[in-house]
Amino acid sequence: MKYTATIGLEVHAQILTKSKMFSGCNAAYASAPANSCIDEVSIGLPGTLPVVNQEAIRKAALLGLALNCEIPEYCEFSRKSYTYPDLPKAWQITMYDKPICINGELEITLGNGETKRVGITRAHLEEDTGMLQHGDETHSLVDYNRSGVPLLEIVSEPDMTTPEEARLYATKLRQILVFLGVNSGNLEEGALRVDANVSIRPEGQKEFGTKVEIKNMNSFRNLERALVYELERQEKVLREGGTIIQETRGWDDAAGITLSQRSKEHAHDYRYFPEPDLPPLELSREWVAERRAELPELPDAKFARYLSEFGLSKQDAALLSGERETADYFETIVATAGAANAKPVANWITGELFRLIKDGAETLAEVAKRVTPANLTSLIDVVAKGEIGSTVAKQVFEEMYRTGETPTAIINAKGLRQISDSSVLTQAARDAIAANPKVVADYKSGKLPAIKFLVGQVMRATKGQANPQVVEEALKTELDATN
C-alpha cells in the first residue's frame, strides 16, 4: 500500500522590537546574563498589567500583508493556561480565535521549476516563554530573559506533501521575515523556531491520518531530515499493523530520530478565554492601508524586475534580490552608474565583492563605506574606457575594498594604467614570438587558438597592463610578417 504525506508547519518568529510584548523591558536578551532582562510583567508579579507593544502589532501586520493575508478589523488577546516552570504566570497571553492575520498564502518554487501555493491559516501574536537550563538529574534552572519577548506564530495549511516542500516553505518564509525586518532569521539562537505537524494516509483516502507534532529542529536541514525520518517511522508502524498515536515528538539530531515527548494536548486543555486586562484591538482600514503603503518591493518581485529591466542572469538576480541590504546596495549603485551598467555592477557585487566579504568575515554595511557607489561606478567607467584591463581592475577593486581609495587614485599611485602604445606592445609581441617557436609553428599550421597563449605571455610580461585587443593585433601582424 502506498501512503500520502500531509505536512503543516508552525513557525515561531521573534519580532525585532526594542521592548517586550507587554512591557517596556529590554527585549535584546541574547547576550545578556541570565535573568537580567526582566521586569515585573515579564515574571508575572501580582498586580502588574500588560500594555501592548504597538511596534509588534505593526510588524505583524506587515508580514501578514506580505503573505496576502486578510487583516481583520478586530483582533483579541486570550489567556492560554498551562503549568510549566518557564511560564511564571501559569498562563501565556496569546491570540486564539481572533488573530491578527488570516487566510494568506506563500508561493514556493520546487526543484523542478514548478511553483506551488501553500496556504497560511493564520498568524497570531503572543509572548515568548522563559528558557530552562537543565543541570544534573536533580535540578533545572530557569532564565526569564526571553519571557515576554514578542512572538509571531505563522500557521500554514496542511498543503505540503514532501519534506522538501516543507524546507522550501520555511526557507522562503524566513527570507520574507528578514527582508521586512520583522525577524533576525537566526535559528541557532532560537529567534526563529519551526514545529511540524505530519501525518500519512493511504493513497486515495480523503480523511487525514493521525497528526504527530515534531519539535527541536534548529535548522531547515534538520527540519527536512526529521520529516523524512518521521514519515518512514509512521509508514513502518502502519505496515506492521500498529496505530499512530497523537503526540509531540522531539528531533534528536545526533541520533537522527524523533523521540516521544508527551501526548498531544487539545485546545480545550488550555482553557482559553479572553485576556481580561487587554481590550480588543481595533485595526481600522486606514491603518491597514498605511501598513500596506509601507511594504517594500518583496524578493520575488525584485527578482522578476532584475530579469526584465536589467537583463541579469537568474543566478545573479536571485543573489541580489534575496536580502534587502544587498538589493538596496545594488540598486543604489545602479542609480549612480546607470541602468546600462547594471550587468557589470551585478558581476562585481556577486563576484569579487561577495568573495572578499566571505574571506574577510565582514558585513556588507561595513564594506559599503569603502566600496561606495561612486567608487564602483568609477571603476566600471575606467574599464569601459580601456584605461585598465579586467585583470588589473580586480587588483584595483581589492585595493579599493581594503582602503576605500578611489580607483583613479589607486591606478595613478601604482602606475596601473593600461598600455595601449602599439610600439611598446609590438616589441613585447616580438619577444613572445621569439620565446615560443613551437606555439608559433602551431599557429602557422592552422591552430589559430594558439595565439591566445602568446597573448597570455605578453599579458604576463606586462603584469596584466597591456591592452589585450592591441596585443592580439600586434601578434597577428608580426606572425603574418614572418610567413
UniProtKB/Swiss-Prot annotation:
Reactions catalysed: L-glutamyl-tRNA(Gln) + L-glutamine + ATP + H2O = L-glutaminyl-tRNA(Gln) + L-glutamate + ADP + phosphate + H(+); L-aspartyl-tRNA(Asn) + L-glutamine + ATP + H2O = L-asparaginyl-tRNA(Asn) + L-glutamate + ADP + phosphate + 2 H(+)
MF GO annotations: asparaginyl-tRNA synthase (glutamine-hydrolyzing) activity; ATP binding; glutaminyl-tRNA synthase (glutamine-hydrolyzing) activity
Presence of the UniProt keyword Kinase in the record: no
InterPro entries: Asn/Gln-tRNA_amidoTrfase_suB/E (IPR017959), Asn/Gln-tRNA_Trfase_suB/E_cat (IPR006075), Asn/Gln_amidotransferase (IPR018027), Asn/Gln_tRNA_amidoTrase-B-like (IPR003789), GatB (IPR004413), GatB_C_1 (IPR042114), GatB_Yqey_C_2 (IPR023168), Gln-tRNA_amidoTrfase_suB_CS (IPR017958)
Root EC class: ligase
Keyword Protein biosynthesis part of the UniProt annotation: yes
Biological process terms in GO annotation: glutaminyl-tRNAGln biosynthesis via transamidation; translation
Assembly: Heterotrimer of A, B and C subunits.
Functional summary from the UniProt entry: Allows the formation of correctly charged Asn-tRNA(Asn) or Gln-tRNA(Gln) through the transamidation of misacylated Asp-tRNA(Asn) or Glu-tRNA(Gln) in organisms which lack either or both of asparaginyl-tRNA or glutaminyl-tRNA synthetases. The reaction takes place in the presence of glutamine and ATP through an activated phospho-Asp-tRNA(Asn) or phospho-Glu-tRNA(Gln).
Record-stated family: Belongs to the GatB/GatE family. GatB subfamily.
Protein name stated in the entry: Aspartyl/glutamyl-tRNA(Asn/Gln) amidotransferase subunit B
Organism field: Herpetosiphon aurantiacus (strain ATCC 23779 / DSM 785 / 114-95)
Gene name of the record: gatB
